Every structure is written in C-alpha cells, then in structure tokens.
C-alpha cells in the first residue's frame, strides 16, 4: 500500500477527538453538487448543532461578484464512507446573509410543504429510481462502447451479467455499499437497458428525507466515479439513436393511497396531475424532450397517459 493510500485511510480517532464535516450543497445549475470540508471539535449527530458556513456564490453561478456571500445551513447528517470514523457528510441548503433562500434552494419550499400538518399526516412515501450513465473520461462515450462505435443492440444488458453485457459493476457495488454505510435508505441497484447505464433506488423514504438521501447518494456516486476516473452523467439522453435514455422515476404514495380503497385515491391524484402536465414537465429538468419521445419505454412529452404495468405511460 502506498503512503498516499495510508494517509487517505488514516484513522483520526486514535489521535484526536476532532472530526471532518463535508458540507454539500446544490450548485448554480440546479444539478451540480459542490462541497467543502471543515474541522469540528468533536462528533455531532444533530444538524442544528452544526455551525452555518459561507462560500463564494459568484464562483458557483449563485451570486454576483459584488455581493457573492452565500450562507450554508446544515439540514441533514450522514456518515462519511470515505473518511469513516466519526466524520460526516452534511446536506445543506443555501441562503442570502439576511436569511432568504436563494433561487436554487428548492429544499426550503419543499420542507415547508412537508412540515404542513395535513401533509405530515399523510406520511408521503417516495421511492426514487435514479438512472445514470458511466462515460469514459476523455471521450465522454459510455463505458463498454468503443469510440464512435456501438455494441450489439439493446436486449442483453438490462440486469445482465458477464464481461460483454455489464460494464462498471465495481463502481456500482462500491456505491451501493457506501450508501448503506452512510445511512441512506438505498433499496437496490440494477444494470439498465443501455450499456454503461445503471440505476439505484432510494426509498421508500418519507417527505424531505427522500430528497436529502437522493442528493447524498448522487454526491457519493460523483466521488466514487471521480476516484475511478470515469464521468457520471444524468443526461436524459446521453447517446442519440436507438438507445434508452435515463431518468429518475418517482414512486409515490400517501397513507390514504396505501389504505383500503386507495386505488380510487390514486386515480383522483392522477386526474389532478393530468391538468397540470405541461407545468410539471417544465419543472422536471432540461433535455427531457430528447428522452420522452414515445419510444424506448417512454411517453411522448406532450401527451399525458397512465396505466398499470405500462412502461410507455407517463404514470
């Protein structure tokens, strides 16, 4: 083992009570993740006991240079699978110095919704299926595909095994275990339909915790792919042509939906979703018009539909 590896895996608890806290937040694109670390005097288990921090928002696309201060408010703590010991990962949201949430802080409004007594009483469950693609670093082409070339057509890769069907499993399994270590309610993984494409599932988790767990799971995956020297892509359609895209399918239920007669409650919710389909699509992220074509197990972006076990439906 090299000296560098020794230092990376150094156990600090033998020599100091101090810990390292990695503060994580969503950057200016609304998709990128940023983080920086600080030393704390001892272990912390309650995010309200953590100090607020600041960063240069002009360097993340979240503030102008003449007024660049953005404040990090710690919101959730997870165990750090990289530094281990008592070290922690901290999910933060972002505010102006006067305490107003900045535009990219979507967590603030979500937390208010989930804390409403009527919402909390329904115990909303989320199960999120995050698809992603692993790309070769220098050419931004899926691992398992030669530059400018393609393997055999889709079919054998979904949940596939073997050197000609599954690419990047070491990264996927490392991520799976790291998430379990961190305390994330990760419920599974599988190879997806396109070579180099995988999925992990978070949940069922209640309310705002589902979002916190998804973002930390994404962060951990970014760190692991950084170590492995490959690029993590959440692009909805990373490769054009006859290949599946990647999304974050969201399974959702309330207590009323899970109780007897819940199927009727589900249908009522679907009717409400249909009425605001275009508004919702606009908020689901950029690039979905390239994925939601009515082909490759998707619904057409302009057409709302629902069904049971229908992979070509919106719901």
Swiss-Prot record:
SMART domains: Gln-synt_C. It is found in: Cytoplasm. It catalyses: L-glutamate + NH4(+) + ATP = L-glutamine + ADP + phosphate + H(+). InterPro entries: Gln_synt_N (IPR008147), Gln_synt_N_sf (IPR036651), Gln_synth/guanido_kin_cat_dom (IPR014746), Gln_synth_cat_dom (IPR008146), Gln_synth_gly_rich_site (IPR027303), Gln_synth_N_conserv_site (IPR027302), Glutamine_Synthetase (IPR050292). Keywords: ATP-binding, Cytoplasm, Ligase, Nitrogen fixation, Nucleotide-binding. Its EC number is 6.3.1.2. One of its GO terms (molecular function) is ATP binding. It comes from the Eukaryota. The keyword Lipoprotein does not apply. This is Glutamine synthetase nodule isozyme. It comes from Lupinus angustifolius.
